[in-house]
Amino acid sequence: MSTEDKMATDDHYKTLEVDRRASDAVISAAYKALVKQAHDAKDEERWKRLNAAYEVLSDTAKRKKHDRTAADSIKRGKVIGDYRILEQIAEGGFGTTYKAEHRLTGKLVCIKHASHVSAHDEQILLDEARSCWDLRHWGIPAMRDILRMPDDSMALVMSYVPGPTLAEVLEKKEYNNGLDAEHVAWIVDRTLNILKYLHFNGVVHGDMKPQNMIIQPEDHTVVLVDYGLSKVKPTRKDGALGYTPFFASPEQESGRVPLPESDFFGLGKTMIFALGGDVEFIKVPEHTPDAMCEFIKHLIKQDPLARPNWQDVDLCEEFRKIRKACFGRTFSNMKPLKI
């Protein structure tokens, strides 16, 4: 094993007596205090361990590699509580997501390991989980459990939802130029129904984007994932923001807490993306029906107070009228998308 790999597998957080989610300032302060103790005690071996640990944890790239090595210890077949890990399916700003199965029932679940969440925000995460605990809707995964992982961080257990994301669908060759407007319409119709349920239950999604929309084309169904995490900020230093540029609302980018209207902004940007438009420069394809263009314009206004809100308008009903005006029907009889 190389010196670098050895450094990546040592428990440097334990050496510096800090939590794995500690800030750079806390790590620096702990290092200075412990090095002084080692120096005063003339403990050369401890001094070397402290320096090795600080060398890794004070460097963003090395710390990231160290954390990834620890996360990689959660392999296929590992048992955590009542669940057996099957595979890693995603990695994002909050941590790693795994597909797992319940050991007794064999039911599939999704475990969201919040490894990049601070100790302070873990309490916020717990509060958010409580608010989502009893939510039941065909368009959102159900909250099943909360776990403590081997590294003492928190993980949310949710029902597993199969299917590609909207982003993955749009990566297919036949959809490189965007989806047919009527396909986008049924996706938006389903998404508005889900958002209405979440918002009326006091939950803001906070990261509306194609990557968080699972498409089940045979049933013309959409499932929103990663909901209810809008108040939790990731601790990673590698660009993770807790929201997604180009899809995030101006208020989120300025650091404010997202609102229901923030979800509408993200939905509007997602519509542009799905239609084959330019999300960055907000250009909608020319073939898009005028009524859908106007709907998008209302959703993506810079001022959240200028966007629609549920108190003034039922967006579900409004969009069904738009579907009727654009396509002559409110329910699509189109063939399923090819996935």
Positions of predicted regions on the chain:
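Conserved activation segment of eukaryotic-like protein kinases, specifically the C-terminal portion
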Residues: D238-E251
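AlphaC helix of the eukaryotic protein kinase fold
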Residues: S118-D134
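Short beta-strand micro-motifs within the conserved protein kinase catalytic domain, predominantly
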Residues: A142-M154
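Conserved short submotifs of the Hanks-type protein kinase catalytic core
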Residues: D151-T165, V169
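Catalytic-loop of the protein kinase fold
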Residues: H199-I215
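Protein kinase glycine-rich loop
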Residues: L86-G93, T97
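Activation segment signature within eukaryotic-like protein kinase domains
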Residues: I187-V188
